[in-house]
Amino acid sequence: MNSRQAWRLFLSQGRGDRWVSRPRGHFSPALRREFFTTTTKEGYDRRPVDITPLEQRKLTFDTHALVQDLETHGFDKTQAETIVSALTALSNVSLDTIYKEMVTQAQQEITVQQLMAHLDAIRKDMVILEKSEFANLRAENEKMKIELDQVKQQLMHETSRIRADNKLDINLERSRVTDMFTDQEKQLMETTTEFTKKDTQTKSIISETSNKIDAEIASLKTLMESNKLETIRYLAASVFTCLAIALGFYRFWK
């Protein structure tokens, strides 16, 4: 490693970048083993599990060999040790950052198991909720059915009562009309009987009056006949008297 590469490491740490430049082939492949990039999703009820000990998270390499390598490339011992110390600190910081952003396969499996357990709990809760809702719906349906039956019974009772009341009213009205018709017929019969009686009485009175008139006419005729005879007699007597007087005067003058 030369001074340019070490300076790049210092600059990257100073800027706060999470990317660390390193020469190709100097870091062991064990640093990249058993790491998987994951996307952190908030909102899951999961428990963070840390199964990697702290001593296994540190970058372990032969610092003495690295110091000797730096000395062979033109650095003195103090500079080489300073660079190795800085590289060790940067490696530890980088590993801490990597462990914060990446998980191991075991951690991923545990997280997946926790998520599956959480999903199972949610599924169970959904099943329980569905059963509870179904039971509530069934109870509500039964309650509505009972209420509908009660309303149906009430409607049937009210219908029967109204029908009975209407039938009773119709029968009463029919009886009243029949009684009224009977009374009217009775009054008509009484009126007819009274009229017939009055007519009979009137006819009897008329007949009696006619008979009286006929009797009076007959008596008047008889009286007129008798008066006529009396008048004739009187006239005859008068004529004879006048003739006798005339004969007397005639004889006297003669």
Curated annotation (Swiss-Prot):
Interacts with MCU. It holds the Pfam family CCDC90-like. The chain crosses the membrane at residues 231-253. InterPro entries: CCDC90-like (IPR024461). The gene is CCDC90B. This is Coiled-coil domain-containing protein 90B, mitochondrial. It is found in: Mitochondrion membrane. Residues 129-164 form a coiled coil. GO terms for cellular component: mitochondrial membrane; mitochondrion. Residues 1-42 form a transit peptide. Its main location: mitochondrion. Keywords: Coiled coil, Membrane, Mitochondrion, Transit peptide, Transmembrane, Transmembrane helix. PANTHER family: COILED-COIL DOMAIN-CONTAINING PROTEIN 90B, MITOCHONDRIAL, PROTEIN FMP32, MITOCHONDRIAL. It is a single-pass membrane protein. Belongs to the CCDC90 family. Gene3D superfamilies: 1.20.5.340.
